[in-house]
């Protein structure tokens, strides 16, 4: 289904409910630049770095697009996904079932989730929705529950240190969304709806958060204007 949620003002606070879940795949494909390519890159990273029978946990798995891509590439991987939106997980379960993929799903908030050992944790545009006071604590749990040699892949919308540069980058991004078919009204409505819900960090803030958890090697492997993907190695 096509994302037309923001054609009119929202009557309630934005949340990943059934309405959003039903159009999420279209929404994210049109709202996040190079989303499909970034997902493919993450799949390749995991395929190359994860050991045989590795345990992979997708934090904020939404409709399980990444988990399905991993299943198609490597049948040996033990896959799990966490999301706090029931509507998202309903679609995720239907999609994985249709392809015969065995995935363990958990319906929980990350700050309440009982983390368990994995070889890879992934959070694609997830941490930006976690309240800042809780964010470091969750990254700490990710590090503590990574097996030695494990990796954490994190994609985030980012801010720039310089306010003027940041403003220009946002303008470039909003032009991108117009090119994807969103009207200026839809863009403005969504921006207002996500204010104080999606809270991005700067590149340095994200890197420092990873370092504070114990990660020693942190690399940026993808960046487009105000979107970036980091890989942290334990």
UniProtKB/Swiss-Prot annotation:
Keywords: S-adenosyl-L-methionine, Transferase. The keyword S-adenosyl-L-methionine applies. GO terms for biological process: tRNA wobble uridine modification. Gene3D superfamilies: Vaccinia Virus protein VP39. It is an enzyme of class 2 (transferase). SUPFAM superfamilies: S-adenosyl-L-methionine-dependent methyltransferases. It catalyses: prephenate + S-adenosyl-L-methionine = carboxy-S-adenosyl-L-methionine + 3-phenylpyruvate + H2O. CDD domains: AdoMet_MTases. Its EC number is 2.1.3.-. The keyword S-adenosyl-L-methionine applies. S-adenosyl-L-methionine binds at residues 35, 60-62, 83-84, 191. GO terms for molecular function: carboxyl- or carbamoyltransferase activity; S-adenosyl-L-methionine binding. HAMAP family: Cx_SAM_synthase. Homodimer. Belongs to the class I-like SAM-binding methyltransferase superfamily. Cx-SAM synthase family. Catalyzes the conversion of S-adenosyl-L-methionine (SAM) to carboxy-S-adenosyl-L-methionine (Cx-SAM). This is Carboxy-S-adenosyl-L-methionine synthase. The gene is cmoA.
